Curated annotation (Swiss-Prot):
It comes from the Eukaryota. It comes from Saccharomyces cerevisiae (strain ATCC 204508 / S288c). One of its GO terms (biological process) is ascospore formation. This is Putative uncharacterized protein YNL296W. Almost completely overlaps MON2. The lineage of its organism: Eukaryota, Fungi, Dikarya, Ascomycota, Saccharomycotina.
Length: 104
């Protein structure tokens, strides 16, 4: 995922892409936004979409189908070349970028 696809520059790595710790944090943002959507709409994991009013879409200025959101989570968590850096213990975004999580 290229940084140009993400409007919040706080999530960009030094090389212009999303680095592994932040990839994990973005996945957490997606999951939290989905849970928020599900709680508000009583939707299921297999249907619906994240509307432009959802917290995730407000943060990234996007609208996405839930299946796309889950593919994004899988990519961010499991398709990293450096899986160790992508673990929860290395997630530094919460400490370095509190506004990202305050927006949730």
């Amino acid at each position: 995922m290229k940084a140009s696809k993400i409007s919040d520059s706080r999530l960009r790595g030094i090389d212009g892409t999303v680095d592994s710790p932040c990839r994990h944090c973005i996945a957490r943002v997606v999951i939290l936004a989905f849970l928020d959507w599900q709680a508000n709409t009583k939707g299921s994991a297999k249907s619906g979409c994240l509307s432009s009013s959802s917290k995730l879409c407000t943060l990234f200025n996007i609208s996405m189908d839930l299946s796309l959101a889950w593919r994004m989570v899988e990519f961010l968590l499991f398709d990293s070349e450096d899986k160790e850096r992508n673990s929860a213990s290395s997630c530094l975004c919460m400490e370095s970028n509190p506004p990202v999580f305050m927006a949730i």
